[in-house]
């Protein structure tokens, strides 16, 4: 069996996340259907992560196996002809049999976008915030995350994870324009709902509703209910996956 990686992007607006759902369309299902139709054999794909409903990916990776050689360039071309317009394949290429889209990934990067003034052209992919936010304080709080190992406070309740340990290597708010910012965070792995919960809690810091000391206490508590609200999914992008 030969193993192949597919690198692609998608607009998650009309999907119930990456993973196949019993009642709702998913990106995984669309990719599997297209591959199976083109290759004329039942194909299963494994993704680098599981984005939630409405979340987007600028660069996602998935792998599949097939027992014959394929023309990767031609397959990528055919996939782009067959897939919906909100999914784009960048490339298909062979990898070693032990390469795994999820478990071989060493770094994942997410961006969360916000804007602080009404803008009809940002509303679909950015969260509108009507607060006067202290981004310097938010970046002080964000930098503390680089010293944290247990992110249980930002894990969706009742998630079936074996560990809540993550190694965050970057967490910073970046200005994109006069009234636009994004939060960039990179780690070896992420918990379910983690990025949106982190952003929601940092917003509380930016509104001066949490002090830096209280933010550290929230992180240390391991209690999801003590952290901020989960932010909307439409402003979250999986930016990149490294191997």
What are these regions (language model features)?
Residues 1-243:
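Structured-RNA-binding interfaces characteristic of tRNA pseudouridine synthases
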């Amino acid at each position: 069996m030969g193993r192949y990686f597919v690198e692609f992007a998608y607009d998650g607006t009309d999907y119930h996340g990456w993973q196949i759902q019993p009642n709702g369309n998913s990106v995984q299902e669309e990719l599997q259907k297209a591959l199976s139709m083109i290759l004329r054999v039942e194909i299963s794909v494994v993704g680098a992560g599981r984005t939630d409903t409405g979340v987007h990916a600028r660069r996602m990776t998935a792998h599949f196996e097939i027992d014959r050689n394929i023309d990767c360039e031609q397959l990528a071309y055919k996939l782009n002809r067959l897939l919906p317009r909100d999914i784009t394949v960048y490339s298909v290429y062979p990898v070693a049999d032990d390469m795994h889209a999820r478990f071989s990934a060493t770094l994942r990067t997410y961006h969360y976008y916000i804007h602080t003034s009404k803008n009809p052209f940002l509303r679909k992919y950015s969260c509108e915030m009507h607060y006067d936010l202290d981004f310097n304080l938010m970046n002080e709080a964000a930098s503390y995350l680089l010293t944290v190992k247990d992110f249980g406070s930002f894990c969706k309740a009742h998630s079936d994870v074996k560990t809540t340990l993550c190694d965050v290597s970057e967490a910073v708010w970046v200005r994109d324009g006069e009234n636009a910012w994004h939060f960039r965070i990179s780690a070896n792995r992420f918990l379910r709902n983690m990025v949106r919960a982190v952003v929601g809690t940092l917003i509380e810091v930016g509104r001066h509703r949490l002090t830096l000391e209280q933010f550290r206490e929230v992180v240390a508590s391991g209690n999801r209910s003590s952290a901020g609200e989960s932010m909307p999914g439409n402003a979250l992008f999986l930016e990149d996956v490294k191997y």
